[in-house]
C-alpha cells in the first residue's frame, strides 16, 4: 500500500509541475483579464483642475486618457476613473467559477485513506454583460474598437476550470485536501485548501440507516495576477448514503448546501498603458489655484483656493496645448474592495469500483448574489443628472446583476484505503 500511495503522489506532483512549466508565447488568451478597460471619464473641457464637470458628459465606455476623448468637442486625454460597477460583477462571477470543488460524499477516506483526482468544472457566465466584454481580453477577431476602448462582441458563455484535487484521511473523522485549479483560455490559476469533518459516518446497523453527515471549510485563492486579488471561502454541509451493488460497486448519492464568500481586491491599475506618468510628470508638487465654484456654493473653499497635486518642471505633456495638470499621474487607480456572498445547493453521485472513482456534481445558486459588506456609495458611478448646489455630485450605488450561476463538475480519481 505504501508503494501505491507514493505512485499517485509522484504522479500528482509531476502533473502540477508540468502544468506550471507550460511554455507560453506571450500572447493574451481570451479569458485573460483586461482591467484597464474598466474605466470611465468626463470629457468636459478641462478648466480649474476639472472641478466643474458637466454631469451630462460622463462617458462609461472605456478609452480614457487618450486623444479619442476629444471627439465632439470634448477634452482630449480626459482623466480616468475606475468603473467599480463592472468590476463588482466581474469579481462575483469569476469567484463562483474558481470556487473550491467538492465532488465527494460526506464519508471521509479514513485514517489511511488517500485520494487523487482530476476534476472538470463548467460554470455559466453572463456573456453579454460589459464586465466580461470589457474585463477580459477576447480574441483579435472578436474585438470592437481599439486600445482601452475595445470590447468583445460577446463574452464567453461558460467558464471551464480544470482542477487537480488531492485528499488525505486523518484521525477522528477529519480529512485534509488541497487543489490546484486553472481557468481554461487564460493564465489564471488558483490554489486551495479544504478541511472536512464527518460528524456521523460509517454506521451500517441500527442508526446506520441514517445518512452520513459532514461539514467542510475550504478556501481558494487566485495566484499570479498582479492587478487582482481574489479569494473564495466556502462552508459546506453534506448528507450522503452509500449503497453496495453486487458486492463490488459502491454507489453514493449526496446532497448538501454551500455558503460562498468572495473577496475581491485590486492592485494599482494603469488605465492608460500607452502613456508614461514619469515622462509626463517626473516631479509632483502641491499648487494652490483659484476655486472655480461660485461664492454661493457651500462647498467652495473659504480661502477661494484649492490645493492640487500638479507637475513641477521637466515634464512633457502628452500633446501640445494639453493642460499641464492633466497628466498621466491621474490615470491610475484602485477598484473598490468587493465582499460578496452566495447560498448554493449541491447534489451529486459518486460511483466507486475497486480504487477507481467517478463523481458527478451539480451546484446552483438558491438566490441571487448579494454583498455581505456593501461598498461605499462614493465608489459608484456618477449620476448624469445635475447636482444640487452645495451637495456632492450624486452617485449610483453599486449593485450585483440578478443572475444566478450553476456549476457542473465531473471528477475521476483513484482512492487508496
Question: Where are these predicted regions, by residue range?
Answer:
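Transmembrane beta-barrel domains of Gram-negative outer membranes and organellar outer membranes
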Residues: 27-203
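Short loop/turn motifs that connect adjacent beta-strands in outer-membrane beta-barrel proteins
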Residues: 104-112, 173, 200-213, 244-251, ...
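Residues that define the transmembrane beta-barrel architecture of outer-membrane proteins
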Residues: 110-112, 157-162, 187-191, 209, ...
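Transmembrane beta-strands of outer-membrane beta-barrel proteins
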Residues: 114-118, 174-176, 193, 208-217, ...
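Transmembrane beta-strands of outer-membrane beta-barrel pores
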Residues: 120-124, 180-186, 197-199, 217-223, ...
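Outer-membrane beta-barrel "beta-signal"
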Residues: 195, 403-417
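Outer-membrane beta-barrel translocator/channel fold
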Residues: 211-309, 314-324, 403, 407
Amino acid at each position: 500500500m505504501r508503494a501505491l500511495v507514493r505512485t499517485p503522489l509522484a504522479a500528482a506532483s509531476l502533473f502540477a509541475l508540468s502544468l506550471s512549466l507550460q511554455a507560453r508565447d506571450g500572447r493574451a488568451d481570451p479569458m485573460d483579464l483586461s482591467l484597464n478597460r474598466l474605466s470611465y471619464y468626463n470629457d468636459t473641457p478641462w478648466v480649474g483642475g476639472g472641478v466643474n464637470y458637466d454631469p451630462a458628459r460622463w462617458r462609461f465606455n472605456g478609452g480614457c486618457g487618450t486623444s479619442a476623448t476629444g471627439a465632439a468637442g470634448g477634452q482630449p486625454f480626459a482623466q480616468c476613473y475606475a468603473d467599480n460597477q463592472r468590476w463588482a460583477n466581474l469579481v462575483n462571477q469569476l469567484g463562483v467559477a474558481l470556487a473550491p470543488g467538492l465532488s465527494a460524499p460526506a464519508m471521509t477516506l479514513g485514517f489511511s485513506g488517500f485520494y487523487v483526482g482530476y476534476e472538470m468544472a463548467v460554470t455559466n457566465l453572463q456573456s453579454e454583460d460589459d464586465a466580461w466584454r470589457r474585463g477580459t481580453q477576447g480574441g483579435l477577431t472578436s474585438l470592437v474598437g481599439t486600445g482601452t476602448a475595445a470590447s468583445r462582441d460577446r463574452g464567453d458563455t461558460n467558464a471551464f476550470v480544470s482542477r487537480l484535487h488531492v485528499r488525505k484521511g486523518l484521525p477522528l473523522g477529519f480529512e485534509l485536501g488541497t487543489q490546484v485549479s486553472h481557468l481554461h483560455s487564460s493564465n489564471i490559476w488558483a490554489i486551495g485548501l479544504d478541511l472536512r469533518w464527518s460528524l456521523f459516518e460509517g454506521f451500517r446497523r441500527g442508526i446506520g440507516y441514517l445518512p452520513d453527515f459532514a461539514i467542510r471549510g475550504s478556501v481558494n485563492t487566485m495566484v499570479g495576477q498582479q492587478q487582482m486579488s481574489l479569494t473564495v471561502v466556502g462552508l459546506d454541509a453534506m448528507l450522503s448514503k452509500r449503497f453496495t451493488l453486487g458486492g463490488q460497486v459502491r454507489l453514493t448519492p449526496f446532497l448538501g448546501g454551500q455558503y460562498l464568500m468572495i473577496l475581491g481586491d485590486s492592485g494599482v491599475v494603469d488605465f492608460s498603458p500607452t502613456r508614461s506618468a514619469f515622462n509626463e510628470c517626473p516631479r509632483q508638487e502641491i499648487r494652490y489655484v483659484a476655486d472655480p465654484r461660485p461664492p454661493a456654493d457651500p462647498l467652495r473653499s473659504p480661502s477661494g483656493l484649492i490645493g492640487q497635486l500638479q507637475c513641477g518642471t521637466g515634464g512633457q505633456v502628452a500633446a501640445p496645448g494639453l493642460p499641464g495638470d492633466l497628466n498621466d499621474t491621474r490615470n491610475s487607480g484602485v477598484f473598490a474592495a468587493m465582499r460578496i456572498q452566495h447560498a448554493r445547493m449541491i447534489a451529486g453521485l459518486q460511483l466507486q469500483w475497486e480504487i477507481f472513482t467517478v463523481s458527478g456534481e451539480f451546484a446552483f445558486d438558491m438566490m441571487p448574489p448579494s454583498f455581505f459588506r456593501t461598498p461605499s456609495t462614493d465608489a459608484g458611478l456618477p449620476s448624469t443628472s445635475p447636482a444640487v448646489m452645495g451637495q456632492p455630485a450624486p452617485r449610483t450605488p453599486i449593485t450585483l446583476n440578478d443572475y444566478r450561476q450553476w456549476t457542473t463538475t465531473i471528477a475521476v480519481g483513484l482512492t487508496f484505503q
